[in-house]
UniProtKB/Swiss-Prot annotation:
Gene Ontology annotations for the cellular component aspect, listed alphabetically: cytosol
Family: Belongs to the RimP family.
Protein species of origin: Leuconostoc mesenteroides subsp. mesenteroides (strain ATCC 8293 / DSM 20343 / BCRC 11652 / CCM 1803 / JCM 6124 / NCDO 523 / NBRC 100496 / NCIMB 8023 / NCTC 12954 / NRRL B-1118 / 37Y)
Family annotation (InterPro entries): Ribosome_maturation_RimP (IPR003728), RimP_C (IPR028998), RimP_C_sf (IPR036847), RimP_N (IPR028989), RimP_N_sf (IPR035956)
Lineage, uppermost ranks: Bacteria, Bacillati, Bacillota, Bacilli, Lactobacillales
GO biological process: ribosomal small subunit assembly; translation
Subcellular locations according to the entry: Cytoplasm
Alphabetical list of Pfam families matching this protein: DUF150_C, RimP_N
UniProt keyword list: Cytoplasm, Ribosome biogenesis
The name this protein goes by in its record: Ribosome maturation factor RimP
Length: 158
């Protein structure tokens, strides 16, 4: 769930995202190593890949917008980091898991508490609903609620 600053930035940049037919995968505003970082992860819909040219164009437009909008949504100094989500993209929202299931991708899940003696599980999403998922692993099917999942990422096999 986005905080107030994140939501304000999302609202401001949404028209740019739509104009470029991009997909906002994630947006965070955090403190890292003593500095504030606004991180925007972009992709293309329908399992297409975003290009460096796409990211460069988007960065220029967002920089200009955030530098000129009044009131300034982020009045303090910060680093703007715009990139693709990458092969090991984070899975945070229900639609992220739907995307991974639709693409038949492997995911890596870290649990808060071990289940069947393990805190980390790798597999494909067999079933998915608003409360959780069933992961097909080498040990069989493992039902998990989203409350049990500490972190999930795409686990692309090369």
């Amino acid at each position: 769930m986005a905080n107030k600053t994140e939501q304000t930035v999302i609202d401001l940049i949404s028209p740019i995202i739509e104009a470029h037919n991009d997909l906002l995968w994630d947006l965070t505003f955090t403190k890292e190593g003593g500095q504030k970082v606004l991180r925007i992860l972009l992709d293309k819909p329908d399992h297409q890949f975003i290009t460096m040219n796409d990211l460069t164009l988007f960065t220029q437009e967002v920089n200009e917008l955030l530098d000129t909008v009044d009131p300034d949504p982020i009045p303090e100094a910060y680093v703007l980091d715009i990139s693709s989500p990458g092969a090991d993209r984070p899975l945070k929202e229900l639609w992220h898991f739907e995307w991974a299931k639709e693409a038949n991708e492997n995911i890596l899940v870290s649990l808060f508490v071990a289940k069947e003696g393990q805190k980390k599980w790798q597999g494909k999403i067999a079933d998915l609903n608003k409360d959780g998922l069933t992961l097909t692993t080498t040990n069989g099917r493992l039902p998990l609620t989203f409350d049990e999942i500490a972190k999930a990422i795409l686990d692309v096999q090369f």
